């Protein structure tokens, strides 16, 4: 869904940045048609989010910039450029790097929050729309994507109670934490989106679920 939205926005003339923050299950670049660009091969050599983090906490004076991580996806259909920052360089060490990240230390000892905020401001100046692919559920990485970085959280869910009440819990927690951020932020907006519409085949069940969605999620919008 995120890749489709990104492509449509670029087609409509918006300058778009897509960021893969799903570090545990990376690969947003695979959803873009390989005929548009060599995105899969680029990930073997071009750094991404994981590499930015390790550069930030590393001892080298020359630090990576997020601009060093940009992969441009080009198409004759796009009126503006579509840029991608992948989860990280796929060089054989990615999994161990992702597993060894200490998020508490990053934020509490390395001032990672201010580093993120600086990048966030630069992204906003450079692009019309920034779309961030997040890990599902309540995780350290998910907190970055639902609390620290976004102005709007799009919550994809399915027609079952676990999914419905799960996204409700996620956004309620995110809003509480969002209000405590030491940065200037407007109210965190939420857009719940059911990922499947089965009204054509299961009309009555679909109608019941839509009523339930409206009732349970009315506080979100």
Model-derived regions: residue spans:
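Solvent-exposed, charged interface segments at domain starts and junctions
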Residues: 1, 5, 58-76, 146-153, ...
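A generic structural signal for short coil/turn motifs at secondary-structure boundaries
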Residues: 1, 94-95, 200-204
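Walker A/P-loop phosphate-binding motif and the immediately C-terminal alpha-helix
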Residues: 1-24, 29-31
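Short secondary-structure boundary/capping segments
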Residues: 2-6, 32-45, 100-102, 145-150, ...
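Conserved catalytic-core segment of NTP-binding enzymes
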Residues: 11-12, 111-221
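Extended hydrophobic secondary-structure segments that form protein cores and membrane-embedded regions
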Residues: 19, 83-86, 189-196
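P-loop/Walker-type NTP enzyme "switch/lid" segment
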Residues: 23-122
